[in-house]
């Protein structure tokens, strides 16, 4: 398959390297984040893989959808307009798969955290919190993966109703709040940890990325899946859709 990459940063270059090593896929084009993008920019592509920034992704979305080429969106930071993006995809008859993290390891981790949250829900002696660490150049805070994990925790645990990113001085966290802490440090690729605590014990579930290849490989694999899916069932997808089909 042929993929057009939008974004030539660290992730874009890693995706290009994975495609080159695959022996079965090709890079049709690489478009810089500030390039003038039109529907013709994606001619001859089987899928688009976007790793840019929020503003560029939202600005280029109409052109990507108008091209008729399915889009894999690895750009984060636009959860507040997610419903609007999904509506645009549907109206255009297009396909878009969004994930804050395409690493298969991370997505297995997220499912593990959700199951752990479900298991402790009936037992009030257990509380849960979440933290993430990334390199100092990462812009969004907390990470999209951390927010995805928080959504999993809230969905599985009726005792947690809202996310707290920072506590004002002098205010204690409430029992129905889930704290999501973020640390920016050095060149950390990404570390996500769920902490489950009681008076008797502590359970720690953690995922550490050793490099970016897992993210890039997952993006290429899901792009190939979406290119085929788009032919018969266009729509707005997530990694859960991809994993559910693979695990069926």
Swiss-Prot record:
Protein EC: 1.17.1.8
Residues the record lists as binding NAD(+): 32, 74-76, 99-102
GO biological process: one example: diaminopimelate biosynthetic process
Pathway assignment: Amino-acid biosynthesis; L-lysine biosynthesis via DAP pathway; (S)-tetrahydrodipicolinate from L-aspartate: step 4/4
The keyword Oxidoreductase is assigned to this record: yes
A single MF term (Gene Ontology): oxidoreductase activity, acting on CH or CH2 groups, NAD or NADP as acceptor
Record flagged with keyword Oxidoreductase: yes
UniProt keyword terms in alphabetical order: Amino-acid biosynthesis, Cytoplasm, Diaminopimelate biosynthesis, Lysine biosynthesis, NAD, NADP, Oxidoreductase
Top EC class, one word: oxidoreductase
Location in the cell: Cytoplasm
Cellular component terms (Gene Ontology): cytosol
Positions of (S)-2,3,4,5-tetrahydrodipicolinate binding: 135, 144-145
Catalytic activity: (S)-2,3,4,5-tetrahydrodipicolinate + NAD(+) + H2O = (2S,4S)-4-hydroxy-2,3,4,5-tetrahydrodipicolinate + NADH + H(+); (S)-2,3,4,5-tetrahydrodipicolinate + NADP(+) + H2O = (2S,4S)-4-hydroxy-2,3,4,5-tetrahydrodipicolinate + NADPH + H(+)
InterPro entries associated with the record: DapB_C, DapB_N, DHDPR_bac, NAD(P)-bd_dom_sf
Superkingdom, taxonomy of origin: Bacteria
Residues the record marks as active site: 134 (proton donor/acceptor), 138 (proton donor)
Pfam families: DapB_C, DapB_N
HAMAP family tied to this protein: DapB (MF_00102)
Protein family membership: Belongs to the DapB family.
Function comment: Catalyzes the conversion of 4-hydroxy-tetrahydrodipicolinate (HTPA) to tetrahydrodipicolinate.
NCBIfam families: dapB
Protein name, as recorded: 4-hydroxy-tetrahydrodipicolinate reductase
Gene behind the chain: dapB
């Amino acid at each position: 398959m042929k993929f057009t990459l939008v974004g030539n940063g660290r992730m874009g270059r890693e995706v290009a390297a994975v495609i080159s090593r695959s022996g079965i896929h090709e890079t049709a084009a690489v478009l810089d984040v500030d390039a003038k993008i039109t529907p013709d920019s994606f001619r001859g592509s089987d899928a688009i893989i976007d790793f840019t920034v929020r503003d560029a992704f939202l600005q280029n979305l109409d052109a990507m959808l108008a091209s008729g080429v399915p889009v894999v969106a690895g750009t984060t930071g636009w959860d507040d307009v997610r419903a609007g993006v999904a509506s645009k995809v549907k109206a255009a008859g297009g396909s878009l798969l969004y994930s804050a993290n395409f690493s298969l390891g991370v997505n297995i981790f997220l499912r593990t955290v959700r199951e752990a949250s479900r298991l402790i829900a009936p037992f009030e002696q257990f509380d849960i919190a979440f933290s993430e660490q990334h390199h100092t150049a990462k812009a969004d805070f907390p990470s999209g993966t951390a927010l995805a994990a928080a959504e999993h925790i809230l969905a599985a645990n009726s005792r947690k109703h809202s996310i707290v990113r920072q506590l004002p001085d002098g205010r204690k966290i409430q029992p129905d709040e889930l704290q999501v802490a973020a640390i920016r440090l050095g060149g950390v690729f990404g570390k996500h940890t769920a902490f489950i605590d009681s008076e008797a014990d502590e359970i720690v579930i953690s995922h550490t990325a050793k490099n970016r290849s897992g993210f890039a490989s997952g993006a290429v694999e899901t792009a190939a899946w979406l290119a085929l899916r788009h032919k018969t069932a266009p729509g707005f997808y997530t990694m859960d859709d991809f994993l559910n089909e693979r695990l069926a």
